[in-house]
Amino acid sequence: MSERQPIRRALVSVYDKSGLDQLAKALIDAQVEVVSTGSTAKELASHGVTVTEVSEITGFPECLDGRVKTLHPKVHAGILADRRLTSHREQLTALEVKPFDLVVCNLYPFAETVAQGGDFDECIEKIDIGGPSMVRAAAKNHANVAVLTNPDQYEDLARALSEGGYTMEERRVLAARAFAHTAAYDVAVATWFGSRDGVAVDGVPTFVGTTGELSHPLRYGENSHQAAAVYRSSGEPGLAGARQLHGKAMSYNNYVDTNSARRAAFDFEAPCVAVIKHSNPCGIATGSDIAEAHRKAHACDSLSAFGGVIATNRPVSVEMAEQVAEIFTEVVVAPGYEDGAVEILSRKKNIRLLECPAPHLAGWELRQIDGGLLAMETDLFQADGDDPANWTLAAGDPVDDVTLADLSFAWRACRSVRSNAILLAHDGASVGVGMGQVNRVDSCRLAVERAGDRAAGSVAASDAFFPFADGPQVLIDAHIAAIVEPGGSIRDDQTIEVCRTAGVPLYFTGTRHFFH
């Protein structure tokens, strides 16, 4: 390992002041000269650090409500000077600039301000200028300067100081993290700015981007010959930061299915369980409690549920845990677990138990294509047609409240099924799912086949319109009680006619929920 770079002088300017007591102790113990700014200097001084204010170095006061603090040649020359070069050392001497060996800086909470609903001016004020400049300068000059951007690095700083400083390899790792930090920050600003009124074009952002920091490598990807890893985005921890309570390490496919399952379960306000396999529902159900919801979801297709992923929108109860313990399950993900539930589930050595709060779905979804990205607003049931009060009765008589509730359930559950999607439901539970077929009539046949005798009296939802009347006829022949679909086909009159003739109520939503 390369020779260590001693740390004799540090520049510290942080917004997030957590861990400053730990940082202060490390700097004091190593007798590091500290230069700092404003409130950071005061906080460090309160922990016993002898601090030199930046304004004493620059001869220029902080100004413009703190907008200008460190943007000065005597600061940046001290960060950027490559002391391996004689000419740089000579210029530092001539300019009376002392170099920095360490820069500790984290940035204004821009993304957090946006997430909290800050107005335009508040968000603008939280765009950091001096901080990213210092961080990038130190990262560029990592041959001479170490840079820290997160309080979680302070403990390792104490270790490095005790060993005589960071090695070149360690400084390079710190620099990479620093550049990732500023890159994510800039992407957040550009994405927000690109969606503002007067900047967006026809309501579409002029810039979209996403960043990810390596969380951990995975054993392999979708298949064993593909490398894979999990990357965490800034903000809410989400599934990528879920707490694993038990079981083997998550696989790539586990993550994909778990992500689909969580979204399906949290599409409902009532206690809900979604059982997912290959990103498609084996069953989705609501119940009076989470154990009942699980029984109903599992009953939809107990054969396919073998080796599936289970997601809940409520903590897993002991009763539900006892039920799941009898089934081979890859993953259970929930916002929590009642006392005793984890112990029951842990009887199965390999089952993966994750604790994760409700998903925070981004306003826009991105999908990579050759040469670019596709971006669209996330489907959050925000359309008028997702409210049954706005549905149009196209055929038959109005249904009673119980049947309407089942139609509403089926409509929401159907969104989680890969297109072409048909979902049959009864009593707040799916009883037959037809997914992923390239024609809609085959999806109808598959849903009816999966439901068996349960098809009679159930209701049906279709994620898109019926192009022909053959699909509805399959459902009618299975004695479906009512159908809900978007409508909009040039042959809607044929679908309306077969439903009218059979006396089957048909509702049009005017909204589609394709899912590819």
From Swiss-Prot:
Record-stated family: Belongs to the PurH family.
EC number: 2.1.2.3, 3.5.4.10
Name of the gene: purH
Keywords noted in UniProt: Hydrolase, Multifunctional enzyme, Purine biosynthesis, Transferase
Annotated Gene3D superfamilies: 3.40.140.20, Methylglyoxal synthase-like domain (3.40.50.1380)
Domain notes: The IMP cyclohydrolase activity resides in the N-terminal region.
GO cellular component entries: cytosol
Pfam families cross-referenced by the UniProt entry: AICARFT_IMPCHas, MGS
Stored PANTHER family: BIFUNCTIONAL PURINE BIOSYNTHESIS PROTEIN ATIC, BIFUNCTIONAL PURINE BIOSYNTHESIS PROTEIN PURH
Gene Ontology biological process terms in this record: 'de novo' IMP biosynthetic process
Domain MGS-like: 1-149
UniProt pathway: Purine metabolism; IMP biosynthesis via de novo pathway; 5-formamido-1-(5-phospho-D-ribosyl)imidazole-4-carboxamide from 5-amino-1-(5-phospho-D-ribosyl)imidazole-4-carboxamide (10-formyl THF route): step 1/1; Purine metabolism; IMP biosynthesis via de novo pathway; IMP from 5-formamido-1-(5-phospho-D-ribosyl)imidazole-4-carboxamide: step 1/1
Gene Ontology MF terms: IMP cyclohydrolase activity; phosphoribosylaminoimidazolecarboxamide formyltransferase activity
Catalytic activity: (6R)-10-formyltetrahydrofolate + 5-amino-1-(5-phospho-beta-D-ribosyl)imidazole-4-carboxamide = 5-formamido-1-(5-phospho-D-ribosyl)imidazole-4-carboxamide + (6S)-5,6,7,8-tetrahydrofolate; IMP + H2O = 5-formamido-1-(5-phospho-D-ribosyl)imidazole-4-carboxamide
Protein name: Bifunctional purine biosynthesis protein PurH
